[in-house]
Amino acid sequence: MVRILRKIKSAAVNPLKSSQPLGAAFAFLGVEGAMPLFHGSQGCTSFALVLFVRHFKEAIPLQTTAMDEVATILGGADHLEEAILNLKTRTKPKLIGVCTTALVETRGEDCASDIANVKLKHVEELAGTEVVLANTPDFDGAIEEGWAKAVAAMIEGITRSGERTRQPKKIAILPGCNLTVADVEHLRDMVESFGLKPVILPDVSGSLDGTVPDRWVTTTYGGTSVEEIRELGTAAQCIVIGEHMRHPAKTLHGLTGVPYAVFQSLTGLKAVDRFVSLLSAVSGAAVPDRVRRHRAQLEDALLDGHFHFGGKKIAIAAEPDQLYQLATFFTGMGCDIAAAVTTTDMSKILQKVPAEWVQIGDLGDLEALAAGADLLVTHSHGRQASRRLEIPLMRVGFPIFDRLGSQHKLTILYRGTRDLIFDVANIFQANQHAPTPEALDPFRKREMPDELRSSPLTRH
């Protein structure tokens, strides 16, 4: 059984985690015509906005209620109402996703009642715009919890409840926040290859894929439509990727009765085989030849790459589901997990991480535990530890701001697992130190007796 080591420091040294409000805003960004709204001070929003822009290299729609000292004391209901009405007038969003911050949560504001009053008071002004609330205090949880709460809030607030007529080819997919833009796009292609029609919530592949719109857009310009969220109850099956998305799936099941299947990871041959089998069973179709070819390519990559992985020591710092995804990938390739650090102990998936223990902590803990490892695996803030320890760094997760194209890398299904094998094997090869001639032949520099040095044989 994995031991979960609690955080004992009173401060964070080179923080690992991102906050719940950021995770909720991230999920809202996967909806078409959405505008995430932080209910808090301007600084909270500015910090999250900087992280998003540095990671995606895109213009990110994100607004704030701009709570000041007076609102903090007297209450922020007026600021929230003013912000919602201003956003409706100026940007005309289809969805306003309100994310609470530590400021209003600590004060104990009843944001749900405040939003209900705003909706009741301004029925005509807010026509055509959904307003959804995600309670996401910064002091609790991390990006995974914020993402999951936002998705659950959208389902609760928008999806029509009750048993609906099922569309046999329609599949609802709830991806975790650890999937990249390329992962979500590849996931859709895989599902569509079986003749199924996926509805992905949230769909960041449509809104954060780097597409430049032909006109200025004040909200998100792609992603899942509000109408698709409203009709999720007509799906024949819900597929969940990541343990943190189990709660939104339960919410959908409770509202509409849609059955769900949870895949805690889609990286690795066995996990993907199970996923493909489910798609084949739901669709009633045989596995397409293209998918079979991708599987054969992965098998070849496993043969080519396993020489470079065996016995390597890996130190990973990531969110719980991504930690599980990567740790199972590396151990499946013959590596040992030398250090496993994560952000929060709220996820049950930590009990399945293939390591002796998991430390709840930060990148300072990773640096202290990673001595002797062959590879560090974390986001861009791990680069200082990599430099000091002289251990190569594989960048994963959020944020990645010192490399381009991180969102266009595949990490799931057959092709993503294949690409991971090649990427990691190439890192190992680029950083291995070739033995010197002296190391291979210890007698090369041996001392010679004086009589042999002066011998005619040595001169010729």
UniProtKB/Swiss-Prot annotation:
Disulfide bonds: none annotated. Pathway: Cofactor biosynthesis; Fe-Mo cofactor biosynthesis. CDD domains: Nitrogenase_NifN_1. One of its GO terms (biological process) is nitrogen fixation. Coiled coil: none annotated. The keyword Metal-binding applies. One of its GO terms (molecular function) is nitrogenase activity. Keywords: Metal-binding, Nitrogen fixation. Residues 441-453 have a biased composition (Basic and acidic residues). [7Fe-Mo-9S-C-homocitryl] cluster binds at C44. Residues 436-460 are annotated as: Disordered. PANTHER family: LIGHT-INDEPENDENT PROTOCHLOROPHYLLIDE REDUCTASE SUBUNIT B. This protein may play a role in the biosynthesis of the prosthetic group of nitrogenase (FeMo cofactor). Belongs to the NifD/NifK/NifE/NifN family. This is Nitrogenase iron-molybdenum cofactor biosynthesis protein NifN.
